[in-house]
């Protein structure tokens, strides 16, 4: 038997022994106590879903006023979670502004919920970009957590009853924004 053949045989035997030991150590023994079940996930509430009521919140706007989502029942609402440092967020803002100007007199409201930035930075950005829709400050990211936002921007369209009707993760085009708004405005309350 050659030297290389002997090495391959030893490797094969070692692999079989290790595999057998692993299988033996993980076997189920009748009458042995069961292990504890895995702990429940940390999240205590499910992610907001299309067709379900939107989680309520009250936040400070950059003008100092308080805005409560529940007070906007009867209107079509776009909740847009964003940040000034987020390039995709910045890219969709002009289309959101155009939609706001076009549909606000038809019962459409934008709530631009900024994630964890200070008011001065948000005010400067809104002024620089000439954005006139309400910008809210989610300083502790509580709304972001309630809506289980993992990517910015994230947008939630609500019908007049406060039910989530569409969710978009990432930037939206003008066509998506306006098409969704038109559909929701056309519905009877």
What does each of the following model-derived ranges do?
Residues 1-53, 180, 189:
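N-terminal targeting signals for export/organelle localization
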Residues 57, 67, 72, 81-85, ...:
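Conserved hydrophobic/aromatic "anchor" residues
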Residues 75-77, 81-85, 151, 161:
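Short pre-active-site segment immediately N-terminal to redox-active cysteine/selenocysteine motifs
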């Amino acid at each position: 038997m050659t030297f290389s053949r002997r090495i391959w045989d030893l490797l094969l035997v070692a692999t079989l022994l290790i595999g057998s030991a692993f299988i033996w150590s993980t076997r189920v023994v009748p009458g042995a106590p069961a292990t504890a079940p895995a702990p429940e996930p940390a999240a205590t509430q499910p992610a907001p879903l299309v067709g379900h009521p939107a989680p309520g919140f009250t936040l400070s706007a950059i003008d100092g006023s308080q805005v409560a989502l529940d007070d906007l029942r009867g209107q079509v609402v776009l909740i847009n979670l964003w940040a000034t440092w987020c390039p995709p967020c910045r890219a969709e803002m002009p289309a959101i502004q155009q939609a706001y100007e076009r549909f606000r007199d038809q019962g459409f409201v934008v709530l631009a919920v900024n994630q964890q930035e200070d008011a001065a930075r948000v005010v400067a950005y809104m002024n620089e970009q000439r954005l006139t829709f309400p910008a809210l400050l989610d300083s502790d990211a509580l709304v972001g957590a309630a809506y289980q936002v993992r990517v910015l921007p994230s947008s939630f369209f609500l019908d007049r009853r406060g039910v989530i009707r569409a969710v978009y993760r990432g930037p939206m085009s003008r066509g998506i924004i306006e098409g969704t708004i038109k559909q929701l405005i056309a519905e009877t309350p």
